[in-house]
Structures are given as C-alpha cells and as structure tokens.
Amino acid sequence: MVSPVTQPSRHSGLGIESVVPPALPGLSPTSESTKPMSASPIADRWIVLKFGGTSVSRRHRWNTIGQLAKKRADETGGRVLVVVSALSGVTNELTAIADGAADSRERVAALVTRHNEFLAELELGAEVLAERLAALQALLDDPRAASRPLDWQAEVLGQGELLSSSVGAAYLRSNGLDFGWMDAREWLDALPPAPNQTEWSQRLSVNCQWQGGGDFKQRFSAQPTRMLISQGFIARHGDGGTAILGRGGSDTSAAYFGALLGASRVEIWTDVPGMFSANPKDVPDARLLTRLDYYEAQEIATTGA
C-alpha cells in the first residue's frame, strides 16, 4: 500500500517521504516519514508515533501503543515520542461547548463521567484526572464563557488531548514503561499572523514553527524518561495562551515534532488497514484502496471522502 498521508499539504516544507512499517494487532500505519539517521548520540535520536481518537479509547489499544513504543525504542536504541488525539468523539463535544451549546453543562458532565469510566476500565484511580476534569468544568464558570472569545474557545477545544495524554501516561507507567508526560504548548509555537489571516484562524487554525535549532533538540532530549507522551492539536499562541491547529491537526503536530527533532521516522497509526472508498463504519461494502498516490488521496479528501 502506498500511504495517502505523506505530508500535510499546507506544510509541504516538512518534506515527508512515505513507507509502510509492519502492522501490530488492532492498529495499522497509514504513513511513515523517513529520513537518514543522523550521527547524533542515541539519546538524541527520536521516533514519533501518532495515534488517533479510536486508537486511544480502549484499554487493549493502549496495550498495543505501549508495546509498539517499547519495540521502537528497543530496536533503535533511541527514544520515542507518542502524540495522541482526544478520545473518540470528545472533540465534537468540546466543539459544541465552545460554540455555546445550550446544554454545555450536561455535555461537560457526560465527558467527566466518560473519562472516569475509562479510568476504571484501566484500573486507575480518579485522582489521575481530578485536576484536569476540574479545569474543564471551571471553563464553564470562567467570566469569558458568556462572550466566548477565541482564546477561551481554544482552551475548551484543547482539553480532550490533555485528558487523553494524561490517562495514557498514567496507564503506561502503571505497566512498568518508562514514560513521561509533556505539554505540547511548551514546545510548539504558533507562527505570527500572516497578512490577511482572520482572527479566527490566528487562534483556532494556526501553523507552527517547525525549523528548530540544536538548542530545541538539546532541551527536549534533556527530559529524563526514555519515552514521552504529548498532545496533538494544541500549541502555544504568541500571547502565551492556547492555540489550535484545526481539525485533523494532531497528524500535523506529529510532523512538526518530527521536523523539530530531526526524527528518523514519523509514523501515523490508525485502527483500519488503510484508506477506503468510503467510511467503512457507515458503508459496509466500502473497498480498501490498495494503491493510492498522494495526489489521488488529496483529490478524494477535497471532495469530502
């Protein structure tokens, strides 16, 4: 299969070339970028793995993520960064809340229940997410909530990835894996506004700096654990607040990290074996497209497939 997700079209400077690594049970790679391994010390060599919402919403999926991350670290002798999306469907709920849905409190309550139930499935205590869920609830009582300014909306939208990554880090550590957690907003910076860029896109559909110097990699690699987990979708705005990369931005986050770290690979993983002619969850007879080049995939995406 030729991967359809070779590089985000609006970030063509990242220069990603696609190959396909072997699949693991329950998850399949949709793309992998490769560049020659640098001569840097092993502690500074990175592989980036990205997992979407359905891939982080069940316990057995997290088991696979942990196994894959450890395998990549062991086989390369390097380090691994895992980038995750929010649990499946959570961003849709947060979008409704950010848009001012009349039943926002009920939606937040449902999200709290769902995440606590997931903690129970993982045999983790409620304290793992106590502060994060309290922060989500507090956003409804924030004075900004009445007028819903863009900076408040960005904070709401980014909660899903902060929650899922916190759950994942706690679970993987409970399984004895050397995982640390990091806030993507401390490492990915939104670019200054472009000419004629709308205020909305300056906050909720940003591009990020992807050309980092040796200082970035040195500081990043100083984090003590062999493997790290972070969030897709979010970055730091120029005012220090939260910025959003836009829907589907978690894949782009992984590409940014890969470029900044000079990673040897960036792998985008999913729970389906490739690109289909239609959504297989909605169309039972959807066909797996066994061969598809980047431009064909781009055309299909443009038509809303």
Question: Which stretches of residues belong to each language-model region?
Answer:
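Nucleotide/pyrophosphate-binding catalytic subdomain
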Residues: 2-3, 17-27, 32-305
